[in-house]
Amino acid sequence: MKEVTVDNYYDGTKMTIPLDERYDGKTNANRYYNKYQKAKNSLKVLQEQIDLTKEEINYFDRMMTLIENADYYDAMEMKEELENLGYLKKKMSKSIRKKKKHPHYQTLKTKDDVLFYVGKNNIQNDYVTFKKAKKTDYWFHVKDMPGSHVIVHSDNLDEYTIRLAAGVAAYYSKGKDSSSVPVNYTQVKTLKKPGGNKPGLVLLGHYKTIYIDPDSSVLKELEKVEER
């Protein structure tokens, strides 16, 4: 038998399937099943590669956003991160982080003496959120876009502080030239660090969202305590 005609259960039509005359019907069926499984597995591998590529694109999108507001020390930490992840070849020289006890994050202070810790790259974001911040501090970050983590060192927020912190997060983000930028905020204790991921990522628990028009004038309302 060279072929067999069967019902197509997806659209109700008839379809003709070629057969290999060297084999019986059962063997032909098994051969087609094996081809199906191979194709299915290939699609699974392809989807995994697509997902990995999307992750890489998102990662470099974050890096491109953060480098716009980076100073020399921020940029050197970003270079070190790329070396550690294998994107750049490591050079035989002492890195900035080996000379410092912690990353070079920024500390700002409001008129009410409330401190903001601002990460200017992925390494700093990880540090201020998961090491520097207390569980009762508040975390701010733009929604669904790359940007700085802003930690408010306080367990009690008023409207002024919320808008100020959200303004800093919006300004140091990919949405800095947009309007009505959504900024999520929550207490640090609700955050989790996803396992096996690159630095700078968090998993959100319960959170609130505020909409802010980014403006560099927000920085004029804050005192720069020290560059760390």
Please name every model-derived segment.
Residues 1-228:
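Extended, highly charged segments
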